[in-house]
């Protein structure tokens, strides 16, 4: 049986690649794509989701825009990483279809209610939409199988020394999600910083002769530029968001640990930090499966093999 999923994202180069990876597989039944502000402004992330689905010929998947700002803060965007459009690099088609008139939360709620099997939510941006869904529709919690999210880290930040971008943008939303009691898998920087795509990997992808692979190669050519800054110490570019889909497809590529995760919402230097209790020091019951390591070569193989399916 295919797993029903909803992708909640803020495209974003790595969000776009996560969508492409997910839709290459018959393991999933994609119910909806919803968007939030984050990597770019809400109008641009919504448009980018429509552009990617148009490229993939998947206008059958309903799309809805969500929260335009965090629950209690002003919006921060990552245009320094993703460019003016949010998907700088490739030439993408204009959307061939329109978003739904309803909001992201309304669309998610409708699809979860209608689903015969529990739904997996895959948020790869700030957690505002997911928090609003859980708060306004407690009756639907029982039909949510799990939340597999990209965000956080066990001890390193990429937006502040303590905080990863997605959680930092809306820590109050993240706090609500981690306290909701729904099974969570956290794909944080500990694992995503190992999921680097190198120049030779981009060449391998470009050698796959279909338009989707060419688009991904173009996305990566732009995305890697930001990560060449020596301060990061990267050889390539970390593909954060596709790790969520890779975990669902091939969990054997990862190492993971059950742990309690708390969200810091008030710290002077640590707002947005995910406090991961690896050693059980708090005595709190584990509320997440936290990913720590990845087989990078296996991850790149999965990505390349998935892109090859678009040639058929």
Swiss-Prot record:
Instruction: Name the GO cellular-component terms.
Output: cytosol
Q: Which residues form the active site?
A: 240
Q: Which GO terms describe its biological process?
A: nucleobase-containing small molecule interconversion; purine nucleoside catabolic process; pyrimidine nucleobase metabolic process
Keywords on this record? Glycosidase, Hydrolase
* Gene3D superfamilies (alphabetical): Ribonucleoside hydrolase-like (3.90.245.10)
> InterPro entries under this entry?
I/U_nuclsd_hydro_CS, Inosine/uridine_hydrolase_dom, IUNH, Pyrim_hydro_RihA, Ribo_hydro-like
* Enzyme Commission number(s): 3.2.-.-
Give the Gene Ontology MF terms in alphabetical order. Answer: purine nucleosidase activity; uridine nucleosidase activity
The enzyme's first-digit EC class, named in words, is: hydrolase
Q: Name one Pfam family in it.
A: IU_nuc_hydro
KW Isomerase (keyword) present: no
Family matches, as CDD domains: nuc_hydro_IU_UC_XIUA
HAMAP family referenced in this protein's UniProt entry, alphabetically: Pyrim_hydro_RihA
The similarity annotation says: Belongs to the IUNH family. RihA subfamily.
Q: Which PANTHER family match?
A: INOSINE-URIDINE PREFERRING NUCLEOSIDE HYDROLASE, URIDINE NUCLEOSIDASE
NCBIfam families attached to this UniProt entry: PRK10443.1 (NF007761)
Q: What is the purpose of this protein?
A: Hydrolyzes cytidine or uridine to ribose and cytosine or uracil, respectively.
Spell out the protein name for this chain: Pyrimidine-specific ribonucleoside hydrolase RihA
Lineage of the organism: Bacteria, Pseudomonadati, Pseudomonadota, Gammaproteobacteria, Alteromonadales
Q: Which gene encodes it?
A: rihA
């Amino acid at each position: 049986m295919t797993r029903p999923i909803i992708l909640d994202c803020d495209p974003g180069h790595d969000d776009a690649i996560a969508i492409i990876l997910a839709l290459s597989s018959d393991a999933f039944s994609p119910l909806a794509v919803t968007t939030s502000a984050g990597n770019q402004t809400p109008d641009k992330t919504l448009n980018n989701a429509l552009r990617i689905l148009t490229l993939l010929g998947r206008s059958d998947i309903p799309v809805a825009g969500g929260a335009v700002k965090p629950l209690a803060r002003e919006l921060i965007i990552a245009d320094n990483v993703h460019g003016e459009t949010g998907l700088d690099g490739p030439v993408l088609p204009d959307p061939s279809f329109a978003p739904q008139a309803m909001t992201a939360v309304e669309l998610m709620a409708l699809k979860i209610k209608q689903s015969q099997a529990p739904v997996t939510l895959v948020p790869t941006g700030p957690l505002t939409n997911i928090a609003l869904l859980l708060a306004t529709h407690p009756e639907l919690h029982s039909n949510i199988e799990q939340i597999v999210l990209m965000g956080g880290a066990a001890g390193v930040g990429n937006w502040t020394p303590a905080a990863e971008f997605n959680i930092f943008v809306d820590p109050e939303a993240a706090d609500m999600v981690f306290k909701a009691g729904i099974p969570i898998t956290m794909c944080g920087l500990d694992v995503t910083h190992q999921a680097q795509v190198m120049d030779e990997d981009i060449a391998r992808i470009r050698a796959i002769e279909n338009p989707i692979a060419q688009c991904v190669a173009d996305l990566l050519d732009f995305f890697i530029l930001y990560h060449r800054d020596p301060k990061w110490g990267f050889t390539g570019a970390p593909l954060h968001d596709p790790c969520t889909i890779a975990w669902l497809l091939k969990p054997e590529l990862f190492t993971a640990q059950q742990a309690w995760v708390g969200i810091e919402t008030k710290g002077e230097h640590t707002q947005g930090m995910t406090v991961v209790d690896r050693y059980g020091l708090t005595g709190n019951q584990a509320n997440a499966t936290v990913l720590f390591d990845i087989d990078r070569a296996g991850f790149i193989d999965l990505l390349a093999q998935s892109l090859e399916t678009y040639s058929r």
